[in-house]
Amino acid sequence: MLDVKLLRANFEEIKQKLAHRGEDLSDFDQFEELDTKRRELIVKVEELKGKRNEVSQQVAALKREKKDADHLIKEMREVGEDIKKLDEELRTVESSLDKIMLSIPNIPHESVPVGETEDDNVEVRKWGELPEFSFEPKPHWDIADQLDILDFERAGKVTGSRFVFYKGLGARLERALYNFMLDLHVDEYGYTEVIPPYMVNRASMTGTGQLPKFEEDAFKIREEDYFLIPTAEVPITNLHRDEILSADELPINYAAFSACFRSEAGSAGRDTRGLIRQHQFNKVELVKFVKPEDSYEELEKLTNQAEKVLQLLELPYRVMSMCTGDLGFTAAKKYDIEVWIPSQNTYREISSCSNFEAFQARRANIRFRREAKGKPEHVHTLNGSGLAVGRTVAALLENYQQEDGSVIIPKALRPYMGNRDVIQP
């Protein structure tokens, strides 16, 4: 959520910046009208309350003098009715204004490239050499089928499309990867490990920006107003909702492993095979609460920490700076880390690292004090995938595949795989 005072003072400038996102700003245009009306109603209500207090004092004075005050009592009742009507009108206006504020996306940071689609994203850097094969590289689902480590067909029978069973060394590989990721982030970078709830309430989904705009993309529990989490970002960010932290506590860094649940409502026909786009998948999420002046330095740190996973696994990747049209609703700046997928001859997203500035903190009411009696300020929140585990499995199977159908296990992962160095058919 944006700062109302900032929006009021810089309406046209902010509107121009948001226009670069390419989103519908029809609701945004109503802000000025409703905000003006709200302030006018508040003035009227306060004036009438002042008048009512004045008349009340006059009534009391007349009664002390044992004089007739019926005409003033009648006037006071009429003023009370007027206040009641204006209060109802004010509540309606404020409700409409709140809906608009929740629908306005974040302002892109000045360093974000202006563009409309993913084609306008800017490559920041690349790492690693692309593998060379003496044979036609297979897609990871064919490799996994030959190794008997993933079962999409039976998952389709048990649940439906975009689900998978991990089996045998496939399950061991998945577990090895998220344990390896957690150990790196906790032991090397000092994150606090958290296991979050996999269901959250409406306030939590609103706090991080999934609601109300993207409710149709979420899995909702029918009997309760709960949602399956699309990412651990939601419960971990809301861990400090409605709290005032002290400056001494910042930065706060959490690393969380969780299952994630996504409807993929807008992805019909895309990535229908394999692990790239599943309704349920595992992810290690990194979440930061920082002072505003530190947030962009922390974004670089966060991105580098996510990159380190791929470097240790020796998987080639590139880092992309997302343009304004591909930034997402909540981020002020976002980097995507894309890993090389040989069978597709392209890079695919495996992590997004974002700085939300105060956007989520304002929605979730997360603040801090620089001094014990200082005025509370909103923290800046950041998060990034460290990494999406299923996509890492896909990248590993494809980049380390051998002509005989086996897959070499990266050296960094072998201690987590019982010191195996290869998965054989």
Swiss-Prot record:
Cellular compartments per GO CC: cytoplasm
Pathway(s) annotated for this protein in UniProt: Aminoacyl-tRNA biosynthesis; selenocysteinyl-tRNA(Sec) biosynthesis; L-seryl-tRNA(Sec) from L-serine and tRNA(Sec): step 1/1
Binding sites annotated in the UniProt record for ATP: R262, S263, E264, E349, I350, S351, S352
GO terms, molecular function: ATP binding; catalytic activity, acting on a protein; serine-tRNA ligase activity; transferase activity
Chain sites annotated for binding L-serine: T231, A232, E233, E285, S385
A Pfam family assignment: tRNA-synt_2b
Catalytically driven reaction(s): tRNA(Ser) + L-serine + ATP = L-seryl-tRNA(Ser) + AMP + diphosphate + H(+); tRNA(Sec) + L-serine + ATP = L-seryl-tRNA(Sec) + AMP + diphosphate + H(+)
CDD domains, A to Z: SerRS_core
Keyword Transmembrane helix: no
Main localisation: cytoplasm
Documented EC number(s): 6.1.1.11
GO BP terms: selenocysteine biosynthetic process; seryl-tRNA aminoacylation
Places the protein is found: Cytoplasm
Keywords, alphabetical: Aminoacyl-tRNA synthetase, ATP-binding, Cytoplasm, Ligase, Nucleotide-binding, Protein biosynthesis
Physiological role: Catalyzes the attachment of serine to tRNA(Ser). Is also able to aminoacylate tRNA(Sec) with serine, to form the misacylated tRNA L-seryl-tRNA(Sec), which will be further converted into selenocysteinyl-tRNA(Sec).
Domains: entry comment: Consists of two distinct domains, a catalytic core and a N-terminal extension that is involved in tRNA binding.
Assembly and interaction partners: Homodimer. The tRNA molecule binds across the dimer.
Family as reported in the entry's similarity comment: Belongs to the class-II aminoacyl-tRNA synthetase family. Type-1 seryl-tRNA synthetase subfamily.
Protein name from the UniProt record: Serine--tRNA ligase
Top-level taxonomy: Bacteria, Bacillati, Bacillota, Bacilli, Bacillales
